[in-house]
């Protein structure tokens, strides 16, 4: 299944986070944090500005990004992978 985000939205595959503490204890449930890092799988065409022009996105497919977990992301399952659909505004940094 192909999925194409609209406007300034992107599709991010969340990267796995280590499920053990520094002391070797396996974390479960609420103690295990979800990663706020992921890989961009698809990007929309850009943000439409007030004057009607299109502003392209700063991120591109393949970028590793750090995003805000609590900022309106929506988790979906696509082809067995957990992906997030979010606005580029919710991405805080590109990892280079």
UniProtKB/Swiss-Prot annotation:
GO terms for molecular function: ATP binding; metal ion binding; protein folding chaperone; protein-folding chaperone binding; unfolded protein binding. It is found in: Cytoplasm. Pfam families: Cpn10. Signal peptide: none annotated. GO terms for cellular component: cytoplasm. Keywords: Chaperone, Cytoplasm. It comes from the Bacteria. One of its GO terms (biological process) is chaperone cofactor-dependent protein refolding. Belongs to the GroES chaperonin family. Heptamer of 7 subunits arranged in a ring. Interacts with the chaperonin GroEL. Together with the chaperonin GroEL, plays an essential role in assisting protein folding. The GroEL-GroES system forms a nano-cage that allows encapsulation of the non-native substrate proteins and provides a physical environment optimized to promote and accelerate protein folding. GroES binds to the apical surface of the GroEL ring, thereby capping the opening of the GroEL channel. This is Co-chaperonin GroES. It comes from Vibrio atlanticus (strain LGP32).
């Amino acid at each position: 299944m192909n999925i194409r985000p609209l406007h300034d939205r992107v599709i991010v595959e969340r990267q796995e986070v280590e499920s053990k503490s520094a002391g070797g204890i396996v974390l479960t449930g609420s103690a295990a944090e979800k990663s706020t890092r992921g890989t961009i799988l698809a990007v929309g065409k850009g943000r439409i500005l007030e004057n009607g022009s299109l502003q392209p996105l700063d991120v591109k497919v393949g970028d590793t990004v750090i995003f805000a977990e609590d900022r309106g992301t929506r988790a979906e399952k696509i082809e067995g992978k957990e992906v997030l659909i979010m606005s580029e505004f919710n991405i805080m940094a590109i990892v280079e």
